[in-house]
Curated annotation (Swiss-Prot):
Similarity field: Belongs to the RGS7BP/RGS9BP family.
Organism of this sequence: Danio rerio (Zebrafish)
Entry keyword set: Cell membrane, Cytoplasm, Lipoprotein, Membrane, Nucleus, Palmitate, Signal transduction inhibitor
Role this protein plays: Regulator of G protein-coupled receptor (GPCR) signaling. Regulatory subunit of the R7-Gbeta5 complexes that acts by controlling the subcellular location of the R7-Gbeta5 complexes. When palmitoylated, it targets the R7-Gbeta5 complexes to the plasma membrane, leading to inhibit G protein alpha subunits. When it is unpalmitoylated, the R7-Gbeta5 complexes undergo a nuclear/cytoplasmic shuttling.
Protein name: Regulator of G-protein signaling 7-binding protein A
Keyword Cytoplasm: yes
Localization of this protein: Nucleus; Cytoplasm; Cell membrane
KW DNA repair (keyword) present: no
Coiled-coil region: none
Annotated lipid attachment (S-palmitoyl cysteine): 243-244
Domain of life of the organism encoding this protein: Eukaryota
Taxonomic path: Eukaryota, Metazoa, Chordata, Craniata, Vertebrata
GO cellular component assignments: cytoplasm; neuron projection; nucleus; plasma membrane; postsynapse
One record GO biological process: negative regulation of signal transduction
Amino acid sequence: MSSAPNGRKNRPRTAGTIFQIGGKAPSRESERRESSEALLAVSDCRMVVQEFNTLVALYRELVISIGEISADCPSLRAEMHKTRTKGCEMARTAHQNLSAISGPEDGEIHPEICRLFIQLQCCLEMYLTEMLKSVCLLGSLQLHRKGKHYLGATKLDSRKEDSSDIPILEDTSSTPPDCPHTYFLVATDIENIERDMTEMKNLLSKLRETMPLPLKNQDDSSLLNLAPYPMVRQRKRRFFGLCCLVSS
Protein backbone atom coordinates (compact mmCIF):
# COMPACT_ATOMS: atom_id res chain seq x y z
CA MET A 1 0.00 0.00 0.00
CA SER A 2 1.50 3.34 -1.05
CA SER A 3 1.73 6.39 1.16
CA ALA A 4 0.40 9.85 0.28
CA PRO A 5 2.78 12.86 0.27
CA ASN A 6 1.26 14.06 3.57
CA GLY A 7 1.95 10.73 5.22
CA ARG A 8 -1.60 9.35 5.03
CA LYS A 9 -2.33 6.04 3.36
CA ASN A 10 -4.50 5.97 0.22
CA ARG A 11 -7.55 3.79 0.76
CA PRO A 12 -9.23 2.06 -2.15
CA ARG A 13 -12.83 2.95 -3.04
CA THR A 14 -15.31 0.83 -1.20
CA ALA A 15 -17.90 -1.23 -2.97
CA GLY A 16 -20.63 0.53 -1.00
CA THR A 17 -19.91 3.81 -2.74
CA ILE A 18 -20.15 2.17 -6.14
CA PHE A 19 -23.43 0.48 -5.35
CA GLN A 20 -24.83 3.68 -3.89
CA ILE A 21 -24.19 5.55 -7.12
CA GLY A 22 -25.56 2.72 -9.20
CA GLY A 23 -28.71 2.61 -7.08
CA LYS A 24 -30.10 5.77 -8.70
CA ALA A 25 -30.49 4.12 -12.09
CA PRO A 26 -33.40 1.84 -11.14
CA SER A 27 -35.22 4.87 -9.71
CA ARG A 28 -34.96 6.74 -13.01
CA GLU A 29 -35.94 3.59 -14.86
CA SER A 30 -39.07 3.17 -12.73
CA GLU A 31 -39.99 6.82 -13.32
CA ARG A 32 -39.67 6.34 -17.07
CA ARG A 33 -41.75 3.18 -16.85
CA GLU A 34 -44.49 4.94 -14.86
CA SER A 35 -44.50 7.84 -17.30
CA SER A 36 -44.79 5.46 -20.25
CA GLU A 37 -47.66 3.60 -18.58
CA ALA A 38 -49.45 6.89 -17.86
CA LEU A 39 -49.12 8.01 -21.48
CA LEU A 40 -50.41 4.64 -22.66
CA ALA A 41 -53.40 4.90 -20.31
CA VAL A 42 -54.23 8.38 -21.61
CA SER A 43 -53.92 7.15 -25.20
CA ASP A 44 -56.26 4.21 -24.53
CA CYS A 45 -58.76 6.50 -22.84
CA ARG A 46 -58.61 8.91 -25.79
CA MET A 47 -59.43 6.08 -28.19
CA VAL A 48 -62.43 5.00 -26.09
CA VAL A 49 -63.79 8.55 -25.89
CA GLN A 50 -63.37 9.03 -29.64
CA GLU A 51 -65.14 5.72 -30.28
CA PHE A 52 -68.03 6.88 -28.11
CA ASN A 53 -67.99 10.18 -30.01
CA THR A 54 -68.35 8.29 -33.29
CA LEU A 55 -71.23 6.20 -31.95
CA VAL A 56 -73.06 9.34 -30.81
CA ALA A 57 -72.70 10.81 -34.30
CA LEU A 58 -73.97 7.56 -35.86
CA TYR A 59 -76.94 7.43 -33.50
CA ARG A 60 -77.76 11.02 -34.40
CA GLU A 61 -77.88 10.09 -38.09
CA LEU A 62 -80.24 7.21 -37.31
CA VAL A 63 -82.52 9.53 -35.34
CA ILE A 64 -82.63 11.89 -38.31
CA SER A 65 -83.66 8.93 -40.47
CA ILE A 66 -86.66 8.32 -38.21
CA GLY A 67 -87.92 11.81 -38.94
CA GLU A 68 -87.71 11.18 -42.68
CA ILE A 69 -90.04 8.16 -42.74
CA SER A 70 -93.79 7.89 -42.20
CA ALA A 71 -93.99 4.15 -41.57
CA ASP A 72 -92.34 1.76 -39.17
CA CYS A 73 -88.96 0.40 -40.24
CA PRO A 74 -87.89 -2.61 -38.14
CA SER A 75 -84.38 -2.67 -39.60
CA LEU A 76 -83.85 0.98 -38.62
CA ARG A 77 -85.08 0.35 -35.09
CA ALA A 78 -82.80 -2.69 -34.83
CA GLU A 79 -79.79 -0.64 -35.97
CA MET A 80 -80.66 2.08 -33.46
CA HIS A 81 -80.87 -0.48 -30.66
CA LYS A 82 -77.51 -1.97 -31.62
CA THR A 83 -75.81 1.44 -31.81
CA ARG A 84 -77.39 2.66 -28.58
CA THR A 85 -76.37 -0.47 -26.67
CA LYS A 86 -72.77 -0.20 -27.81
CA GLY A 87 -72.76 3.54 -27.12
CA CYS A 88 -73.86 3.01 -23.51
CA GLU A 89 -71.15 0.39 -23.07
CA MET A 90 -68.45 2.69 -24.45
CA ALA A 91 -69.66 5.56 -22.24
CA ARG A 92 -69.33 3.39 -19.13
CA THR A 93 -65.86 2.24 -20.18
CA ALA A 94 -64.72 5.81 -20.90
CA HIS A 95 -65.91 6.98 -17.48
CA GLN A 96 -64.12 4.12 -15.72
CA ASN A 97 -60.87 4.78 -17.59
CA LEU A 98 -60.98 8.52 -16.94
CA SER A 99 -61.70 8.02 -13.25
CA ALA A 100 -58.68 5.71 -13.02
CA ILE A 101 -56.18 8.13 -14.59
CA SER A 102 -57.45 11.44 -13.21
CA GLY A 103 -55.27 11.16 -10.10
CA PRO A 104 -55.85 13.03 -6.81
CA GLU A 105 -58.69 15.51 -6.88
CA ASP A 106 -56.61 18.47 -5.69
CA GLY A 107 -53.41 17.67 -7.57
CA GLU A 108 -52.12 18.80 -10.93
CA ILE A 109 -53.84 17.24 -13.90
CA HIS A 110 -52.61 16.89 -17.45
CA PRO A 111 -54.50 19.15 -19.92
CA GLU A 112 -55.22 16.17 -22.17
CA ILE A 113 -57.13 14.48 -19.34
CA CYS A 114 -59.11 17.69 -18.82
CA ARG A 115 -60.06 17.74 -22.50
CA LEU A 116 -61.15 14.10 -22.34
CA PHE A 117 -63.36 14.83 -19.34
CA ILE A 118 -64.99 17.75 -21.15
CA GLN A 119 -65.37 15.85 -24.41
CA LEU A 120 -67.00 12.91 -22.63
CA GLN A 121 -69.37 15.26 -20.84
CA CYS A 122 -70.35 16.96 -24.12
CA CYS A 123 -70.86 13.60 -25.83
CA LEU A 124 -73.05 12.33 -22.99
CA GLU A 125 -75.18 15.47 -23.09
CA MET A 126 -75.63 15.16 -26.86
CA TYR A 127 -76.32 11.44 -26.51
CA LEU A 128 -79.12 12.14 -24.04
CA THR A 129 -80.55 14.80 -26.35
CA GLU A 130 -80.62 12.43 -29.32
CA MET A 131 -82.22 9.66 -27.27
CA LEU A 132 -84.93 12.09 -26.17
CA LYS A 133 -85.50 13.02 -29.82
CA SER A 134 -85.81 9.37 -30.79
CA VAL A 135 -88.44 8.82 -28.08
CA CYS A 136 -90.45 11.79 -29.35
CA LEU A 137 -90.19 10.69 -33.00
CA LEU A 138 -91.11 7.08 -32.29
CA GLY A 139 -94.03 8.25 -30.18
CA SER A 140 -95.30 10.58 -32.90
CA LEU A 141 -94.91 7.75 -35.41
CA GLN A 142 -97.11 5.59 -33.21
CA LEU A 143 -99.77 8.31 -33.04
CA HIS A 144 -99.59 8.84 -36.80
CA ARG A 145 -100.03 5.12 -37.42
CA LYS A 146 -102.95 4.89 -34.98
CA GLY A 147 -104.59 7.91 -36.62
CA LYS A 148 -104.36 6.36 -40.08
CA HIS A 149 -105.72 3.09 -38.73
CA TYR A 150 -108.66 4.88 -37.08
CA LEU A 151 -109.47 6.92 -40.20
CA GLY A 152 -109.30 3.81 -42.36
CA ALA A 153 -111.71 1.97 -40.08
CA THR A 154 -114.12 4.96 -40.09
CA LYS A 155 -114.14 5.14 -43.88
CA LEU A 156 -114.74 1.41 -44.12
CA ASP A 157 -117.72 1.63 -41.74
CA SER A 158 -119.24 4.50 -43.71
CA ARG A 159 -118.85 2.59 -46.96
CA LYS A 160 -120.49 -0.50 -45.43
CA GLU A 161 -123.56 1.60 -44.62
CA ASP A 162 -124.04 2.26 -48.33
CA SER A 163 -127.04 0.37 -49.74
CA SER A 164 -125.22 -0.43 -52.95
CA ASP A 165 -124.77 -4.10 -53.81
CA ILE A 166 -121.26 -3.50 -55.17
CA PRO A 167 -118.72 -5.45 -53.07
CA ILE A 168 -116.27 -3.30 -51.10
CA LEU A 169 -112.57 -4.14 -51.18
CA GLU A 170 -110.68 -3.05 -48.07
CA ASP A 171 -107.47 -1.12 -48.70
CA THR A 172 -104.87 -2.64 -46.40
CA SER A 173 -101.81 -1.20 -48.09
CA SER A 174 -101.39 1.54 -45.50
CA THR A 175 -102.21 -0.58 -42.45
CA PRO A 176 -100.07 -3.66 -41.80
CA PRO A 177 -101.96 -6.76 -40.67
CA ASP A 178 -99.88 -7.03 -37.49
CA CYS A 179 -100.55 -3.52 -36.18
CA PRO A 180 -100.96 -4.54 -32.51
CA HIS A 181 -97.68 -6.45 -32.64
CA THR A 182 -95.93 -3.46 -34.24
CA TYR A 183 -97.34 -1.15 -31.57
CA PHE A 184 -95.96 -3.46 -28.91
CA LEU A 185 -92.47 -3.59 -30.49
CA VAL A 186 -92.22 0.18 -30.85
CA ALA A 187 -93.52 0.72 -27.32
CA THR A 188 -90.88 -1.71 -26.05
CA ASP A 189 -88.18 0.22 -27.92
CA ILE A 190 -89.38 3.46 -26.33
CA GLU A 191 -89.22 1.89 -22.86
CA ASN A 192 -85.69 0.63 -23.53
CA ILE A 193 -84.56 4.07 -24.70
CA GLU A 194 -86.02 5.69 -21.58
CA ARG A 195 -84.22 3.11 -19.43
CA ASP A 196 -80.91 3.87 -21.19
CA MET A 197 -81.56 7.59 -20.77
CA THR A 198 -81.90 7.13 -17.02
CA GLU A 199 -78.64 5.18 -16.91
CA MET A 200 -76.78 7.80 -18.94
CA LYS A 201 -78.15 10.61 -16.76
CA ASN A 202 -76.79 8.85 -13.69
CA LEU A 203 -73.46 8.33 -15.45
CA LEU A 204 -73.31 12.03 -16.34
CA SER A 205 -73.92 12.92 -12.69
CA LYS A 206 -71.11 10.57 -11.61
CA LEU A 207 -68.81 12.08 -14.24
CA ARG A 208 -69.42 15.58 -12.89
CA GLU A 209 -68.75 14.36 -9.36
CA THR A 210 -65.46 12.67 -10.31
CA MET A 211 -64.19 15.58 -12.38
CA PRO A 212 -60.85 17.00 -11.19
CA LEU A 213 -61.09 19.98 -8.87
CA PRO A 214 -59.78 22.51 -11.46
CA LEU A 215 -62.73 21.64 -13.70
CA LYS A 216 -65.28 21.78 -10.87
CA ASN A 217 -64.21 25.29 -9.88
CA GLN A 218 -64.73 26.76 -13.34
CA ASP A 219 -67.87 27.81 -15.12
CA ASP A 220 -68.90 26.48 -18.53
CA SER A 221 -67.36 29.37 -20.47
CA SER A 222 -63.93 28.84 -18.92
CA LEU A 223 -64.17 25.09 -19.53
CA LEU A 224 -64.54 25.76 -23.23
CA ASN A 225 -61.34 27.83 -23.10
CA LEU A 226 -59.38 25.13 -21.29
CA ALA A 227 -55.62 25.44 -21.82
CA PRO A 228 -52.52 23.71 -20.37
CA TYR A 229 -51.97 24.50 -16.70
CA PRO A 230 -51.84 27.05 -15.26
CA MET A 231 -55.32 27.53 -16.70
CA VAL A 232 -55.62 30.90 -18.43
CA ARG A 233 -58.09 32.23 -20.94
CA GLN A 234 -56.85 32.01 -24.51
CA ARG A 235 -58.30 32.41 -27.97
CA LYS A 236 -60.67 29.60 -28.87
CA ARG A 237 -59.50 26.94 -31.30
CA ARG A 238 -61.89 24.32 -32.63
CA PHE A 239 -60.99 20.73 -33.44
CA PHE A 240 -63.07 19.56 -36.39
CA GLY A 241 -63.85 16.00 -37.38
CA LEU A 242 -65.65 15.07 -34.17
CA CYS A 243 -69.30 15.02 -33.21
CA CYS A 244 -68.67 17.03 -30.04
CA LEU A 245 -66.38 20.00 -30.63
CA VAL A 246 -64.18 20.97 -27.69
CA SER A 247 -62.28 24.24 -27.69
CA SER A 248 -58.88 24.52 -26.11
